[in-house]
């Protein structure tokens, strides 16, 4: 790159958008920092694409404000904003070559032929398509077509690049490779990336921060670590990755060291109480959602011994073992009838005894520090 492009800071302030009686975006507020790789993550129909279209200028909000670098762009047409969009469908001109597709927006700006040539070759090199400049879109693979679409969106050097689920039409391996390339492009250009996806692994692997949406609302904004390890609502806990969640009632709350609190929870589905640490005190009697990730649960054929840290131990049997490459997934039915999911590397890699098999009686356990309590119960 000749020089790093200055990305835009984007602020969405109390933005709402309805289609008839359907509220697609409900008072969304988020500040996207200059040069950030920011993902908007949520299930189909949650409003994330509508929000992206509002940023792009394809839709106008019913209320609220939208600013680029602290200047409102409401009423400013899509072609006048410092943003470009990469669509899921690529939207390439089938009769134009790779070179001509990328050059098209520069020609609309009436730049000189020399500058167009220089800029197109620069971005062709950036997306590793130097050898394909004379090919038509139908002569390219899906991944190559998507690279052309990305180069065309970047060649005008916008302040914001909007990516509307750009990888969803590609196979898993190609998605993984292009995701790495997108992250590299972001680092090389300095442009603000706003990435729309329903795929949690995509968002977690490349984002500086993530906004999780559901039913038109932004439920949580945070780093990938915060979203995964410290979910703000039970929906976020269940939607991001896989987890075991149980509605619970706080029985007691005791202050412990390191400014933490030890909670005792009554969990009807498990038919007993369990312990979990929390950063903040929670009043006894409060209904909460307890969650523990499958990879944080230990599974064994023998009952665990006593430990210095409080340990939650349950007995059950393996209802279904699932081979998943480097690890196994176990669905364990506890004595209460509840099902708990456990992830563990294969026993042969761990060298900790015989493989656990279907119908084996097992013990599942986790430390009080490995669970998490969510106070905001949405679902």
From Swiss-Prot:
Gene Ontology molecular function terms on file: ABC-type putrescine transporter activity; ATP binding; ATP hydrolysis activity
Subcellular location: Cell inner membrane
Catalytic activity, EC: 7.6.2.11
Pfam families, A to Z: ABC_tran (PF00005), TOBE_2 (PF08402)
Entry-linked Gene3D superfamilies: 2.40.50.100, P-loop containing nucleotide triphosphate hydrolases
Lineage: superkingdom: Bacteria
Binding of ATP, residues: 42-49
Residue intervals of the ABC transporter domain: 10-240
Membrane-topology annotation of the record: Peripheral membrane protein
EC top class, as a word: translocase
Principal subcellular localization: membrane
Name of the protein: Spermidine/putrescine import ATP-binding protein PotA
Taxonomic classification: Bacteria, Pseudomonadati, Spirochaetota, Spirochaetia, Spirochaetales
